[in-house]
């Protein structure tokens, strides 16, 4: 007599459990998609170096374009450090913006010529314009690894105490500049 | 026949050569013991460009430079752990091919085992649940009742 009617609630739960699981999964995936749409790239590595002092570097200059770039050049005022190379296609796409920033002449913009032939770097700058104040050569990625760089271009905002405050991965767009980097620089100056 | 032999040789070579290493002769350390340590460390470090290869396997230029740095640190007398820590300080846990057990990675490490355990429990419950209800022998009273019913099958018994 009691068979079959003993646990009706547990039976119902088992029946709807798969639906609940599917709905939960849909929610998780949907959140991920929305994140990506909002510009949160899940593949992007958040730098562990944020809010830590810039690494110790002492990079030689490009030939006849001295001096090079050392850690002490990144202290005393807010600076930008851009990792680039003549081989880097994406660097070319952000170059006009860097030229504009240099023309405004409001913030020192330093370059690290990453894994590049010095002559190739110089030719590239001669052809496309040279927005940099100081440039250090990094032929063996010593500075790049010290900065936790995964690809070029990357740009760091360093405050006046020589602490890394922001890292931008990939080419800087006008939107990145006006909405994120420029306001941050302004804020760090106060 | 010759072609057949050559084909088998190529096939064998492809089958045997499952892993290739990117370390070039001029990168290697002179001391074989230190070189061996550098290889071991390199196999724990992820190529941050390609992300699914160790720096030991990767031909990316940044991986090459990371191998060089690993060898410099080993030569300078760093322990294996110190070299890994050096990289983690710059790239975060992301650079390790075997993620460390932290609050963030605990699900990654033990989640599969928890799921296996859960699945096992569910299966065990299904197996233990008797599929056929065991039939108990009738009591003498019940037997008598059945007897009475079958004898008088046309009469309905409401009790």
Model-predicted regions and their roles:
Chain A
Residues 126-131, 138-189:
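Thiol/disulfide oxidoreductase modules built on the thioredoxin-like
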Residues 92-129, 138-145:
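Structural microenvironment flanking redox-active thiols in thiol-disulfide oxidoreductases
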Residues 80-81, 109, 155:
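Hydrophobic beta-strand anchors of alpha/beta hydrolase catalytic cores
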Residues 51, 56, 106-107, 131-132:
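A generic structural signal for alpha->beta connector loops
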Residues 37-40, 60-66, 135-138:
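Short gly/ser/thr-rich secondary-structure transition/capping motifs
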Residues 82-88, 114:
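Aromatic-flanked redox-active Cys/Sec active sites in thiol-based oxidoreductases
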Residues 57-80:
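A short beta-strand-turn-helix
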Residues 1-60, 190:
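N-terminal targeting signals for export/organelle localization
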